[in-house]
Design a protein with these regions (language model features):
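Cyclic nucleotide signaling catalytic output domains
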Residues: 107, 133, 147-148, 154-162, ...
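Alpha-helical scaffold within the catalytic cores of cyclic-nucleotide enzymes
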Residues: 94-98, 126-147, 173-175
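Residue-level recognition of strand-loop junctions within catalytic nucleotide-signaling folds
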Residues: 79, 118-122, 160-161
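Conserved nucleotide-binding and Mg2+-coordinating catalytic segments in signaling enzymes
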Residues: 34-53, 69-83, 91
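Hydrophobic framework residues that shape the active-site pocket
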Residues: 74, 93, 107, 115, ...
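Signal-transducing coiled-coil linker helices
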Residues: 2-41, 49-62
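Conserved helix-loop-beta segment at the catalytic/binding core of cyclic-nucleotide signaling proteins
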Residues: 38, 94-125, 142
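Active-site-flanking beta-strand signature of metal-NTP-handling nucleotidyl enzymes
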Residues: 65-70, 107
Length: 211
């Protein structure tokens, strides 16, 4: 075997190594793009695409609770101080929400000041505890560009144990319950009772008050 044969083998090995690196880079880029597609660029939480991805994988497996959170008076803050301050406030609130996320508790920002919390494998009393915890976490002063900002939240809750309940129906129920919480004075949560077609089962103020 002469030296040219060795050189040829080395060249082939180098080409294979380069191709493998290129494949790995492409796959990493694809994975990064998938992550970015599911991530809200303002808050870093999952976005609407992430929520759709969750629903596509869930397919009615196990008990599920949907908590629809809307920040109280956020529009006033946004209009008064500007969108950049509003975005900073959303990031701060999202940081608080991320403290209680895990594989069974997922947080999504679906637009504006609206968030969805999904709780898997849930029990009703634990869902209400989570709602109170969320209200307690976000209800505090936030300091953005020398402004002291204070927000509270209104939460609508719906739960299902059935694989036949569609996501659109669940979101509509949680949304309706959230608006019921708004009508009750905000800074509280309400639970949708599907069997009676009623919005309110129980309302409690945040953990710092009545829980």
């Amino acid at each position: 075997v002469n030296i040219l044969d060795y050189i040829g083998v080395i060249i082939v090995i180098i080409i294979i190594a380069v191709l493998l690196v290129m494949v790995i880079v492409v796959e990493l880029d694809k994975k990064k793009l998938r992550v970015l597609a599911y991530q809200d660029e303002v808050t870093g939480l999952f976005n609407r695409n992430g929520l759709e991805h969750f629903w596509s994988r869930y397919k009615g497996k196990g008990e599920l609770a949907v908590l629809y959170l809307d920040l109280d008076h956020f529009k006033t803050i946004n209009d008064t101080f500007g969108h950049h301050v509003g975005d900073a406030l959303l990031r701060n609130v999202s940081t608080e929400l991320s403290r209680i996320t895990n594989q069974n508790q997922l947080a999504f920002r679906i637009g504006g000041d609206e968030f969805i919390f999904i709780m898997k494998n849930c029990e009703p009393h634990k869902v209400e505890i989570l709602a109170g915890l969320i209200l307690g976490l976000i209800s505090k002063p936030y300091y953005v560009e020398d402004h002291e900002l204070f927000v509270t939240g209104s939460i609508g809750i719906t739960m299902t144990q059935s694989s036949t309940v569609e996501k659109t129906k669940l979101l509509a129920e949680a949304d309706a319950a959230m608006y019921a919480a708004k009508r009750l004075g905000k800074n509280c949560y309400s639970v949708y009772r599907r069997n009676r077609q009623q919005f309110i089962e129980k309302v409690k103020m945040n953990m710092g008050k009545n829980i």
